[in-house]
Amino acid sequence: MRKYSQRHIPVMVREVIEFLKPEDEKIILDCTVGEGGHSKAILEHCPGCRIIGIDVDSEVLRIAEEKLKEFSDRASLFKISYREADFLLKTLGVEKVDGILMDLGVSTYQLKGENRGFTFEREEPLDMRMDLESEVTAQKVLNELPEEELARIIFEYGEEKKFARRIARKIVENRPLNTTLDLVKAVREALPSYEIRRRKRHFATKTFQAIRIYVNRELENLKEFLRKAEDLLNPGGRIVVISFHSLEDRIVKETFRNSKKLRILTEKPVRPSEEEIRENPRARSGRLRAAERIEKGGD
């Protein structure tokens, strides 16, 4: 694994623990264990609870294993997609869990590590895969999909409402794209200079988000898992989801609202405190929603 020195700061830890309410002898399923920050905080807070942590990224899992090695008797980590969590639990002989945590953000390692292709800040191969065993890369998507399909992806997944077609056209004109800076160049050429100046965030943020979501099937996977999540929880068990853009948040909100087996604990999404945002600016866009499995309703 590459040398990596960036410190990962998990988002909204206090709120996660407050809503999950981990207790001794209870099992928490961390669906996006990442570098292990939330899991470590939960295990420190609750000396008798157990964590089952999963992630598709084998590189961040190795970081999590190191971070959680002092809790090896209470933390079990697995490389698997959360959409297959029900299969994993069955394999482990775990019928139900008492808490589910999902932190849908890109990890610090994925952003700051080398050659993952998630960042527009430096030149890297156009990869963007969270699961390095997947065959679909950003480079393949950007160089092979038709212009119309690229425009749809950028419009829907990047919420790039005005300039999606122009960006898609420039991507096609600039083919082949091989690095992250090739994609930045195409977006820069597509946007009017006044639009670049007007944007509060980097002008390529929306396009990078769109391609990343498509490469990793993020929204499809989230929908598929949330449909099953309520049946993985014991009565009184809780699910906590932290999302970082409106597409994810909308899916979580609607799934919770439409469920007959969940009681919503957060009528509106909980946002990070101003103090946390000062200490960790990446927390700014975080939105936390929580729900509790009720006794009745479809069993």
From Swiss-Prot:
Biological processes per GO annotation: rRNA base methylation
Group of enzyme by EC: transferase
Pfam families: Methyltransf_5
GO MF, any single term: rRNA (cytosine-N4-)-methyltransferase activity
The keyword Hydrolase is annotated on this UniProt entry: no
Domain of life: Bacteria
Catalytic reaction equation(s): cytidine(1402) in 16S rRNA + S-adenosyl-L-methionine = N(4)-methylcytidine(1402) in 16S rRNA + S-adenosyl-L-homocysteine + H(+)
Binding positions (S-adenosyl-L-methionine): G36, G37, H38, D55, D103, Q110
Family of this protein: Belongs to the methyltransferase superfamily. RsmH family.
Biological function: Specifically methylates the N4 position of cytidine in position 1402 (C1402) of 16S rRNA.
Record's protein name: Ribosomal RNA small subunit methyltransferase H
Species assigned in the record: Thermotoga petrophila (strain ATCC BAA-488 / DSM 13995 / JCM 10881 / RKU-1)
